[in-house]
Design a protein with these regions (language model features):
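Local sequence-structure signature of Cys/Sec-based thiol-disulfide redox active-site neighborhoods
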Residues: 1-33
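Active-site-adjacent beta-strand anchor residues
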Residues: 9, 70-71
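Nucleotide phosphate-binding site architecture
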Residues: 14, 36, 70
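Thioredoxin-like thiol-disulfide oxidoreductase module
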Residues: 35-56
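A short, hydrophobic beta-strand/beta-hairpin element that forms part of a small beta-sheet core
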Residues: 60-69
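A basic- and aromatic-enriched beta-loop-alpha substructure that forms the phosphate/nucleotide-
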Residues: 74
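Thiol-/selenol-based redox modules, centered on thioredoxin-like
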Residues: 78-83
Length: 83
């Protein structure tokens, strides 16, 4: 069974795009929210989730299982995924 992967991203963020591309290249399925494309109500709700995981609320915020990774860090992502 695959570890659940959730990304909190911005559509214009180069590190967010690199993270998605990396996961796609590794054939990893993931859910994501591009916060800047959400309506205000949804964005505010999800920002509260992000703040609980990453108090600085920076992007990408990546949740792999129970591990939170802030930023595009290939080595940490690989380790969390067991790749």
């Amino acid at each position: 069974m695959q570890i659940p992967v959730k990304l909190y991203t911005l559509s214009t963020c180069s590190h967010c795009k690199a993270t998605k591309q990396f996961l796609d290249n590794c054939s990893v399925k993931y859910d994501f929210d591009d916060l800047d494309l959400l309506n205000a109500e949804e964005r505010n709700r999800i920002l509260e989730e992000v703040k609980k995981l990453n108090k600085d609320c920076t992007f990408p915020t990546i949740v792999i299982g129970d591990k939170v990774i802030v930023g595009f860090k290939e080595k940490e992502i690989n380790e969390a995924l067991g790749l």
